[in-house]
Amino acid sequence: SYTEYPECLNVASDSAGNTLLIKQKDFISCYSPETGSFQDVHVRGMNEEVSKVLFAEGERQFFIFDADGCLLEICPDFDSFPLALDIRKTPIHEKKIDRAYYLDGILYYVDMENRFYSYRMKDRQKKYLADLTCWMNQYGNLSRIALFHSTPYLVFRNGLLLNIDNQEEALGFDVGLFCVLPDRKQDILWVGTDGQGVRMYYDKYNRFSGIQLKSLPIVMRNPVRSIY
């Protein structure tokens, strides 16, 4: 954790432990294990609202997908003093961006017209996936996206789990949903609910079971906001 940047959500680290985060307006904060501290680099116009997602693709290679639909490649030079950032901007979408996620080498994003796209970083291939308007009108905004069996599963805030490749079998809930996490060792997708514990989704059997909050060894009455 970074105590000097409380409640920071825009943070990414590469395999060497180099870390970039966005918390302060007009700055990108950079950490290197060699120095053991953060340096704040001025980047005009940068803030938490502009940066829809921040992620690392390789050592000392970071990307920001911004609200204007531009992909910013950021390569920090930790050997220079003061620290310098090489920033290259590439427009990849013509509409404003609502939200974005990065999963296993692929950038997923929803624009302000509720169109859902993927952008494969390896070969810079953009693909239209779906129009989410009808789902968002009924179930609210996206809470999270997860890959399960290499397929994007979309979690909607007001109670919907949607397999983007099989929308006819969308699973509705009578409770709000906050988060989702694929199990690394079992064929299970964990879904955190608003006050009804954690649900387990078995894709093989196309069914759910659950763990209620009262069954946990600790007293917990709040919604499940995240799963690790």
Model-predicted regions and their roles:
Residues S1-Y228:
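Carboxylate-rich, polar loop motifs that coordinate divalent cations or form catalytic acidic clusters
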